[in-house]
Amino acid sequence: MHWVDATVKNQQGPQIVSTGISPSGPIHLGNLREIITGDLLFRGCRDKGLESELIYLADDMDPLRKKYPFLSDEYEAHVGKPLRHIPSPDGNGLYSDYFLNPFIKSASELGIFPRIIKAGDLYRDGKMGEVIRIAIQNRDKIRTLIETISGRELEKEWFPYNPICSSCGRINSTTGYELNGDLVSYKCECGHEGKSNIFKEEGKLPWRIEWPAKWKVLGVTIEPFGKDHGTVGGSYDTGKAIAENIYGYPAPLPLMFERILLKGKGAMHSSTGNVIPASEILSFCPPEIVRFLMSRVPSTRHIEFDPGMGFLSLMDEYQRIVKDHKPEDSRIIELSSPFGSDEREVIDYRHIATLVQIYDDPTKILKIIKSTGVETSLEDISKIMTLAKHWIVNYAPETFKFSILPKTQVVKITDEEKIVVSDFIHWAQLPDSQWEATSIHNAIHIIIKEHGIEPANGFRIFYSILIGKERGPRLGFFLSAMDKKTLLERFKFVVSSS
């Protein structure tokens, strides 16, 4: 049983799966794990026959915590203000939407279509008013729960509601101290004193209270979350206690997920710039592979993502399990598909990444791919060509990149190597020789073996003639993709001129 189905097997009745983020910076591959995990759980419930909904909560009432390296100096003046009250870095709209909207687009490309809920809208529309009132009325009980479970002591003046200062606009510099009717009296570090209406967009609950309050308001039944929230005494533990003891609401089924690390760079953080934005990964990685990255392993296992050659290995792994289609892999394939279909035909990305360095003609590449027995379309080939080109320029190691040498460029090879190349030319001109990858590979292997040459050294002869390197793409596929007449002319020139 796939880990998704095992997680939701005991769920009954309608389900609301909740995920979310604070849109304070570029929303990246690491953040994608949350929404993809949420979507996997949503699909697990739906496939179980349960009425289900996926919601995505944008915490746009969170304050800007500091001026991040990717922001201009003018944002120093906005530190402490709610993200939805800050101008966008491009000067067009809101700060929170600037980072949220591209992510929503990326999610749709991944086949994820949650109901988007903005925290600020919940406060603006008065939906948080009663849970705020309950929190303030139970201030002492909540303090005891948080201090007992988390093991940390709250400040003496701690108050379970953070008003927005009507003078300076900050939410992290105020202290509420009294609720009269619907109004919370507060003082701000800027010197201003005022009143905040709990039924308006004039403040917010602290995170450890806001999370369980939203469970109740939104009817959440399942929620995946990062390991930082799932530590002993962490925000899930306090949230569960507050939900059950203060709000009388059962805590949702939890599922902790591990981080995604960038190979050699560690965990991704928007604040440090160590990220691959969601939109960027989809510029070189097919959507089903992003989903496969998450669905193939339990959520509790950390993932190390290598955008270089490791990415090609991931592509190869997906291609292999789709081709083999073992019963135990069918659910992974299904959950990896953006739109839930069982897509059996997979185009060899590694092969395309080689071909686009030889040809820039999708029609030519389509013909080559079809010759390998894969049925696909010009549209699909063009899409993968675009992805592969982006990967080559931005992530491929130099060892993978190449360019074809001019037909008349001199390359020095030994007399023994000339004989090897001449033998290959002879084989290629035989009436019964087949100009396809496997036959070419086998022919070269036989020829170099007859001359007592190690395979790596034998292959190096052909790579040096064609691309001036000691290593290159899979040789059989590489040669079969090239024009036979042009290729043999190149080999004959080198044999005769060196």
What are the language-model segments listed below?
Residues M1-Q12, I27, E53-I55, R143, ...:
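Basic, alpha-helical terminal appendages of large translation-related enzymes
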Residues T231, Y236, E258-N394, I467-S498:
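Catalytic adenosine-cofactor/nucleotide-binding cores of aminoacyl-tRNA synthetases and other
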Residues D62-H78, V131-I132, G266-A267, G273:
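Charged, often glycine-rich, active-site loop that binds/positions anionic groups
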